[in-house]
Amino acid sequence: MVRARRGVLLKCDPSIKALIVQIDSERHDIILEELDETHLLVHPTKVEFIKMELNRLLSKNIYNPLDEEEEEH
């Protein structure tokens, strides 16, 4: 039987997909379907939340020398 679901198709590299899966593991309301290693079907109202969470996670992993200067002063 065929099911139709409204969603947004995301194409991303496997490392970003892993981060989105990690975000979804906490909430269980983001990913509708994992299609393959680079495609996800996600809930249409969660796209902005995914962007914000990815930016937050990725910014924690970026080295910024200016941060060290601020801590020294």
Curated annotation (Swiss-Prot):
This is General transcription and DNA repair factor IIH subunit TFB5. Component of the 7-subunit TFIIH core complex composed of XPB/SSL2, XPD/RAD3, SSL1, TFB1, TFB2, TFB4 and TFB5, which is active in NER. The core complex associates with the 3-subunit CTD-kinase module TFIIK composed of CCL1, KIN28 and TFB3 to form the 10-subunit holoenzyme (holo-TFIIH) active in transcription. Coiled coil: none annotated. The keyword Transcription regulation applies. It comes from Candida glabrata (strain ATCC 2001 / BCRC 20586 / JCM 3761 / NBRC 0622 / NRRL Y-65 / CBS 138). The gene is TFB5. One of its GO terms (cellular component) is cytosol. One of its GO terms (biological process) is nucleotide-excision repair, preincision complex assembly. Keywords: DNA damage, DNA repair, Nucleus, Transcription, Transcription regulation. InterPro entries: TFB5-like_sf, TFIIH_TTDA/Tfb5. Belongs to the TFB5 family. The keyword Transcription applies. Component of the general transcription and DNA repair factor IIH (TFIIH) core complex, which is involved in general and transcription-coupled nucleotide excision repair (NER) of damaged DNA and, when complexed to TFIIK, in RNA transcription by RNA polymerase II. In NER, TFIIH acts by opening DNA around the lesion to allow the excision of the damaged oligonucleotide and its replacement by a new DNA fragment. In transcription, TFIIH has an essential role in transcription initiation. It is found in: Nucleus. It comes from the Eukaryota. PANTHER family: GENERAL TRANSCRIPTION FACTOR IIH SUBUNIT 5. Pfam families: Tfb5 (PF06331).
